[in-house]
A protein has these predicted regions:
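A structural signal for short loop-to-beta-strand junctions that line the ligand-binding cleft
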Residues: 90-95, 113-145, 161, 171-174
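Ligand-binding pocket segment of bilobal, Venus flytrap-like solute-binding proteins
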Residues: 188, 193-260
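Mature extracytoplasmic/periplasmic domains
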Residues: 272-337
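Conserved C-terminal helix/tail region of periplasmic/extracytoplasmic solute-binding proteins
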Residues: 332-364
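Periplasmic solute-binding protein
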Residues: 100-111, 130-158, 186-187, 269-275
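Early extracytoplasmic/lumenal segment of secretory-pathway proteins
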Residues: 44-104
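Short beta-strand->loop
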Residues: 49-52, 131-132, 147-149, 155, ...
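Periplasmic-binding protein-like
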Residues: 122, 127, 141, 202-206, ...
Length: 364
């Protein structure tokens, strides 16, 4: 008889050919047990490039990590995300940024990949998403008219177009026309009226300026407070932030918000948004991030913390934002008519907007 010795864990088994079947069973059982032992695998993660400020984004990412178990690694930039994505393909899975012009420019450069998520499609209205799924808005802000409560009657205000009327001569302040928020507004005028009409409007707006374009949106509120001008153009959420600051509350309290174009297309909206990069290594995790940021919890946090408008319907505005436009007919609890034109179309006119800014020498 064929006979050998085989040792497993100090137990010596003497077996013959008849016992070979038993040995096969033991090996099978051993392999099965090994498969039950947890394997050491890298933790899920997502690498993020953000042009949103760290203090604002940090609580959202903490909530994301706690809810999903995905680690969020972030690099913060003030600007230059297009160049960074070109220089370091594959280093970033998701981009978080502000302004439709930024999102459109990077999409046109081929640095995003399409995402087809039923969660995002449900949470975010179609006008706030790229038609090809290349990016999605996460919050919105209105580009509104700031006005002096003491020197301007509501009956004087109506539309963006009317800001070029002679009655506003030497009464308007703006920041640089080349700032992304103004470029987006001018792009929306081109989308609505065409290049020639938008240029005429921009020339009329320039003619009505009380001073050379300067400062930021908060600076326009301060200028109204100081009497340098009566009317300005700015984003809604800045007013919310100013009302929370002791050193700026008095400025903001003297200025009202008017939502233009309520009787036609609605107020121009801009956004913060997100996208999955073309070379994302952790694509699934990047999609999970955008889904989370478009969901109820993150949308509520955006609204309450930064006084932005949630893009998901049914999420409450902050108390401050709900008070905006309270004196304006047709505006109730801060709810107003928004321009529903797809933002990708508006963003596509950004180069023409810059061209007519050059042609009218807006900042000079």
């Amino acid at each position: 008889l064929f006979e050998r010795s085989f040792k497993i864990d100090f137990v010596k088994i003497i077996y013959t050919g008849e016992k070979l079947n038993l040995m096969n069973k033991l090996l099978t059982l051993t392999l099965g047990c090994l498969l039950l032992i947890p394997q050491l695998v890298p933790a899920a993660e997502v690498n993020i490039l953000s042009e949103r400020q760290e203090f604002l984004l940090r609580p959202f990412l903490k909530a994301f990590e706690e809810n999903t178990g995905i680690k969020a690694n972030v690099v913060y930039l003030k600007k230059g995300s297009l160049e960074r994505l070109k220089q370091q393909p594959g280093a970033v899975d998701a981009l978080l940024t502000v302004d439709i012009s930024n999102l459109t420019a990077i999409a046109e450069a081929g640095l995003f990949q399409p995402v087809n998520s039923s969660v995002i499609n449900k949470n975010v209205p179609s006008n706030y998403r790229d038609p090809k799924g290349l990016w999605s808005a996460l919050t919105a802000r209105g580009r509104v008219i700031y006005y002096s409560k003491d020197r301007v009657k509501l009956s004087e205000l109506s539309t963006y177009e009317a800001l070029a009327d002679a009655k506003f001569a030497k009464r308007i302040c703006t920041r640089s026309g080349y700032h992304k928020y103004n470029v987006a507004l001018i792009s929306s005028m081109i989308a609505e009226h065409g290049v020639a009409a938008a240029k005429n409007w921009l020339q009329g707006l320039k003619n009505n300026l009380a001073r050379k374009p300067q400062g930021n949106d908060r600076g326009q509120v301060k200028a109204i407070y100081q009497g340098q001008c009566d009317v300005a153009i700015g984003n809604t959420y800045y007013m919310g932030k100013m009302l929370e600051r002791d050193d700026q509350r008095e400025w903001a309290a003297s200025v009202g918000i008017f939502f233009p174009n309520q009787n036609d297309r609605g107020t121009h909206m801009n956004v913060s948004g997100g996208a999955v990069t073309r070379d994302a290594v952790n694509k699934n995790e990047a999609v999970r991030l955008l889904e989370f940021l478009s969901g109820d919890l993150a949308q509520y946090m955006y609204a309450q913390v930064n006084h932005e408008y949630p893009v998901k319907e049914g999420v409450s505005y902050s108390g401050i934002v709900s008070s905006f436009g309270s004196s304006q007919e047709g505006v109730k609890k801060g709810i107003f008519k928004q321009d529903k034109r797809n933002l990708s179309e508006i963003g596509s006119y950004r180069k023409k907007a810059i061209q007519i800014l050059d042609e009218v020498n807006y900042d000079k």
